[in-house]
Amino acid sequence: WASLAPDAGAILMDIQAATISYFRGWYVYASGLFMVIALLLAVVPKTARIRLGAESDRPEFSRFAWFSMMFGAGIGVGMLTYSTAEPLAHFANNPDVILGATTALERDNLAAAYKWTLLHYGLTPWGCYAIVGMSLAYFAYRRNMPLTIRSPFTAVLSAESGRRIGGVVDAAAILATIIGIGVTIGYGVNQLAFGMHQITGWEWLVSEGRPSLTALFVAVVFLTLAAMLSALSGIGRGIRWLSNLNMALSWLLLLIFVIFGATAFAGEMFVAGLLEYLSQIGQMSVTVWSSTDTPTARALSDWQSAWNIFYWAWWIAFTPFVGLFLARVSRGRTIGEYVIGAILAPSLMCFAWFCIIGGTALDL
């Protein structure tokens, strides 16, 4: 329906987003922090030694391939699109600017811009993915249950209740995945069309300053075929090969920026932004601004709805898809190793990416 009536669909989805933000924004926001805390509690020595599988099971993939596949499943076009755009956007406006604690487009706002950027791509989104993947892997490989979203729920319910709720849970997971993938593809095809236009200069790719329908259609077909070929080749072949290539190209791009970019400035932002983020992650993760009659309150609420709550809903919508994949490739890993590989390592990778590439853009 949205594809046939995009304007009406956009209006309805804007209304739904505003409704969720107003009535359930606090729940969406608090869920992310809860997942991070639950994962950090799982790395206590006794729990960290538990293997996701039988004690004799060993990992199917090397650490590099395992991390590459998890990182590629959890993030992609968003990091490419927003590695420069988001730090620049927050440098111009963020809650600290709205509250008057820092000044827009001034040096005192740099650390604040990065702490909000790192909040959106740090422990919280990876925690959402990781806790779903860990619970699925635990019940699938240690309790011999099917590797489905319903398994953790049916394990704690009676057989009758489990059968009843299982179908609903799986259906909700499928719907959430479709919505999450739809958002990602929307960003991806726009970026692909604009990028090809910048490289080739082909006019048919852009119409009235936006990607043309023909360009979007071609981009969707291309991405769909690439995804199909990757999936049909299997995890051990095509997906692993593409993930390794993706990781190698990511490191190559980072190396280019380290050599030719604003390395000293990026390093300064990495340290300052990371310290600011770690010292305030608790406060940033529980503060929910409500829209009242004051202009400041409305500005804070609008900013949080457009950024934080939108991101959290996006990450949570993707958790069934990404969580299943993380569980599939993590058999034989210990919980401690899993937490490091699924939340800490990718968070640091995102921090480095945004600080090195985004820092170069800010320095310019």
Regions from the language model: what does each represent?
Residues 161, 165-168, 172-340, 345-364:
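Membrane-embedded translocation segments of transport machinery
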Residues 20-25, 54-73, 104-106, 113-122, ...:
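Transmembrane-helix boundary/entry motifs in multi-pass membrane transporters
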Residues 33-43, 76-80, 130-142, 258, ...:
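Hydrophobic alpha-helical membrane-embedded segments
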Residues 1-107, 232, 255:
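N-terminal alpha-helical transmembrane segments of multi-pass membrane transport
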Residues 22-36, 119-135:
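Alpha-helical transmembrane segments
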Residues 14-18, 91, 97-120, 280-304:
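Interfacial loop/helix-cap signal at membrane boundaries in integral membrane proteins
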Residues 1-7, 71-91, 125-135, 143-147, ...:
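Hydrophobic transmembrane alpha-helices that form the core helical bundles
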Residues 4-20, 41-60, 112-120, 134-145, ...:
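Membrane-water interface regions at transmembrane-helix termini and the short interhelical loops
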